[in-house]
Each structure stands twice: as C-alpha cells, then as structure tokens.
C-alpha cells in the first residue's frame, strides 16, 4: 500500500444524502491521515440498528448529510499519521465507536471506559484534530461548474466505504489469523451485549437473568450470560421468530408479551419466585425499561440499560422504587476499554468462549447495501456482512 501513502485515495463509498433516502454507491476522495490518525482499508462491514436509526433521521440533532454511516467492521491499516505507534501498515484492525486514548484520567481508571476525548458521541461528525472531514466528493452546480462537497463522519468510524480515516484511539489491532468476518461483530453489537453481562452486571454462575429485546445486542447479552454460567436466561420479545435463535445463545425461557394477560414483570416474578437477579433492557423503550426493572428481585436485583433511547422521555421510576435495594445502571460498549481489553476478548471468542457464528445471518456484496438495510428493517437479519473490499492475500 506504499504507493498510496500520503496521497488522496479515490474509492467507492455508500453515501446517505438525507433521511430515509437510499444510500448511493459513489466515488469519493479520502484524504491522508493527519497526526494521530489512521487510514484503513475496510474489508467487511455489518449493519447495526444504530446505522438504521441515523439513516431514518430518528433524532433530529444527529442529522448531518451527506454522511458515511457504518461502525462495525474489520480492515487493514493502509497508512498512519504522525505520532501513531501502536499500529502500522498491514496490521489487521477493527474500528470502535468508543475510543481509548490511554492518557486521560478516565482511561487511567478502572471504573469507566468513556475516554474524555474520544468517547462515543452520536452528534460528532468531524475529526478531532482540526474539526474537518477526511471525505469529499464532487458535485455539479448550476451552469455546469463543479465544487468539492465535504462528507461527514459517523460515530468515530464511517465504515461503509473502501477506505476510512479514524482517530488512532478508535483503532484496535487484532490477531491476523482471526476469522475476519466474525471479528467485525466486536466493533459494536457483540461486545456491547456480552460486556453488559460480564463487565457491568458481572453475572455470576447459577444466577438468573432476563433479557428484554432479542436483537443482536440482546442475544449477545444472553450469550454472555450463558458463558458465565447463568442457570436461567429468560428472553422477552414480541417477535416469536427470534426465539429459535435465542436457544442457540442459551436462552432457557421465552416470553412473548402479546401472549400475556398480565404485565411481563409479574409473569417473571411468578416463574422465578420473586424476580431475576439481573435484567437487561435492549430495546430503547422506556416502558420496557420499567418492566425490566420491576422484573428484578427486591433487595439485590440489578437492571442494565443497553438500548439506545432516542426520545426525550424521562426514566419512569419513583425514587422509593430504588429504596428496596434494586439497582439500575447504564452500559456503553459493554464497559470494554477497546484498546486494552478488546484484543483479549477477541482471543476468547476465537477459543469458543463466546459463539460468533450464529450472529451472522446474511452476507451480501457492497453494492447490495440497501437490500441489507431492508433486511434489518424487516426483522429478517441479525447481522448482514457486506464485503466492502477484496482481500488479495493473507
């Protein structure tokens, strides 16, 4: 890749030009990385509901177009900017939307993974260095003239492109012999779910759990709880078609709210003798959050917020409901510090501690990205892997 270092690269990217507008595969220019930045050739990328939410324009504050979405991927370092020491040309890496500088007070503490400078920020659309973008395209103006049009970044990553530029804090080196398609899942969904069970709730062997929402993240929570030896994993979802997949992730009981004549939390309390030890809310619905909280056992029950909440509604709890010892906490990227902890997690996945294969339900070429979005919208896909670039040799 030496022939492209320090030069602008012209490549293909899927650009979204407005809410709910089909993505356009088009030619863009990708600038060289600046200080503490890395330019990566993307090999595979998958689609997450967060991509879908931004494409939908669900949160007006997040709207910024044109934009390159995508944040779950795996790729090869093409070149690095000044000061980058931990990765080099040819390294296999995964991008992470939540970075780790290793220098700030948060990175130096065990209690949090929210780096002061590179933590996840859905409103962020430019690079930290200079407040500019590294993507652009040419648009035609009236009268036949043309001009360069900047294209915004997304979640510190932007992976629906053959080449992307990231802050080095958001690039994690992985084993070159790892299964690349599966490794892309660690950029978001699987790490977020498994980490919520391992790092945030700290699920113990023999304990009971309830997972509300059996999408990719919810199933990853279940898989994490299974790997930790949970004796009972209750899956809650209104889509009965998800239950079969849940069995592969260790779910022992299934509840479809549509089949009940009583609140879900009441049913869970009845079948568990008072409530579960841990509950996980993975839908981003505050009403479901209340059910998840009330499904935990008085005195020690713990509820973890994993879903994204786009609405301005507040937490539907009375302070006295916390008085009895139940807890509620949030989770970002499963509590994983990406650079210092994700490589070990990847090794555990390679050893089979966590099963990654069942999460990949579809594979499509890059040019079929709009079909992949439709599969997710229709609930027919957990993770659809897109081949962005060809891997010539390994």
From Swiss-Prot:
Its main location: cytoplasm. It catalyses: a primary alcohol + NAD(+) = an aldehyde + NADH + H(+); a secondary alcohol + NAD(+) = a ketone + NADH + H(+). Binds 2 Zn(2+) ions per subunit. InterPro entries: ADH-like_C, ADH-like_N, ADH_Zn_CS, GroES-like_sf, NAD(P)-bd_dom_sf. PROSITE patterns: ADH_ZINC. SUPFAM superfamilies: GroES-like (SSF50129), NAD(P)-binding Rossmann-fold domains (SSF51735). It comes from the Eukaryota. It is found in: Cytoplasm. One of its GO terms (cellular component) is cytoplasm. An alcohol binds at residues 50, 71. GO terms for molecular function: alcohol dehydrogenase (NAD+) activity; zinc ion binding. Zn(2+) 2 binds at residues 101, 104, 107, 115. NAD(+) binds at residues 50, 213-218, 237, 242, 283, 306-308, 333, 383. Its cofactor is Zn(2+). Homodimer. This is Alcohol dehydrogenase-like 3.
